[in-house]
Amino acid sequence: MKESELIGKVHSAVCHQCQQRGYAAPADVLVDVGVLPKEKYEDWRFGKVRYLEAVCTCNLKKLSFIMKQIRSYAKKSNLKPSFCYYKRWGVKKKHGHKPVIPLRFSKSGNPEIEKAYATHYVDLGRAEQLKKEKMEKAAAVQAGRLDKTSGMPEINISENNNG
């Protein structure tokens, strides 16, 4: 894939994610771009893979380029960086609580690289709009229930005057 095609795919993936949910996550961009199979991502989340880079289908140079393009698009689009702590899925409770097992993104474990992968980019305007839409939808559902019953259970009264 040409560099220009890859840039387009990365920018498109970030834009699409922001439209869908108000933020973009680098790991999801890697899935969308096609360099991280979804099943391998899930294996990593469940702790079956030591680090995320190991299951990506491209070399570290290309991964680094993709990460740079994500940051570039985020800066250009005024997306707010927000660190997200990634922990293992499917951890069983011990002594009443789940132990938190952090996930690793890179082979090196370099804190700057780890932070770059774990940083989500938030479209504050779109996130607020999605939150508002969700609240309006919940209110409409609630209002629909109340309209049908006028806040009270429906009672059918029939009069039989056979007198």
Regions found by a protein language model. Name each.
Residues 30:
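The alpha-helix within a helix-turn-helix
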Residues 1, 5, 9, 58-61, ...:
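Alpha-helix boundary/N-cap detector
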Residues 4-27, 36-37, 43-55:
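Positively charged, polyanion-binding regions of nucleic-acid-associated proteins
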Residues 39, 60-163:
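Phospho-regulated, low-complexity intrinsically disordered regions of nuclear gene-regulatory
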